[in-house]
């Protein structure tokens, strides 16, 4: 623990542009909340498909399902969650607005989706559009799946439902096409006459589309014009889904989390540095190799511009030129072990330092910083080999942001990450990027990463026997 004299020495001996130690009040180093129960299960990939009535949502869902034949996939329709029409409303059912958000039992929809995300089977009601009741027996049994497609006109309306989705698709179609499809569908499938369909369209469907459905288009990640006729868009969506299904569950939740592709070589190096019997020399050697891979991967996320050069043969090569304004910031002291790899990759790079030190049991922290004066103009590679609770990372990132560094300009590099720390950092800072080589099982009761690799700084710098 740093004494007052230590603080004064550091502050007075440093004649540069940093402010020494900062007293941070009320910053508890408590363990973050445990991951939600559903994250302990294999996380399904949830796709929301919204759009106006008869825009082609069902066709798009069917085509996605057909191309996901090798995956467990299921479609959940918002139509299944209509409220029952009571006896009073049934007398004037033609004046009942089925396109209003209040027509749906959103709470039941949320309950069913939460159970599916937790790996539990659910019974979903079957809604009868002739009796306007959801008591058709038997209910539809939906089992847990790798992919859940949630389809409906208003699934983007409630933010709680939107937050369940990993991908949001809006199916767009011309108004006249949607009207023609609706007339055909409602007369054939729902037993309605054309006059009733047109009356309902002008009274409820069209106003609801303009008031409630169209405004949710802004939440979509992907907009598909022409619906099921757009085969190129659907093929690209399916490719993206296959990519996500091959990733760690946390990568499906947080698009700003990147885990380098695992190979036998990488797993072999992890085996060596995790082994408590590995010598200091071998630990440093293989740690440096892994760190170099993480650094190289992190550099690949920097912005670039196209550049043409002339080769010794006189030919023109079209390549790229990465941004010049770059610096590293290591979290003392374990983060300093990553500096050599960064210098080897980026000759002459400036490297700053941050020390986050807990003082006593009151949760207060001392922060020491030594950063480039123009850090607000640079892309920052934040270095810390282990992401555990996420407390230190959060404080380091907040400090960088307070210095004017845009959140999107920070790339956090580490060797291993605990899910608890990933959740904390990604939720608080959704625009930073985290690059790691492996996701751990979690934290134990002593807040240590498991299976982990012990106290990294002590093992790397040879102070574990002191």
Swiss-Prot record:
Q: Which residues form a coiled coil?
A: none
Give the UniProt keywords, A-Z: Allosteric enzyme, Glycosyltransferase, GTP-binding, Kinase, Multifunctional enzyme, Nucleotide-binding, Transferase
Residues where 5-phospho-alpha-D-ribose 1-diphosphate binds: 333, 358, 384, 389-392, 455
Q: What is this protein called?
A: Uridine kinase-like protein 3
Q: What is its EC number?
A: 2.7.1.48, 2.4.2.9
**Disruption-associated phenotype:** No visible phenotype. No decrease in uracil phosphoribosyltransferase activity.
**Region of interest called Uridine kinase, as start-end residue ranges on this chain:** 41-246
Q: How is its activity regulated?
A: Allosterically activated by GTP.
Which positions bind GTP?
Answer: 280, 289, 323-326, 378
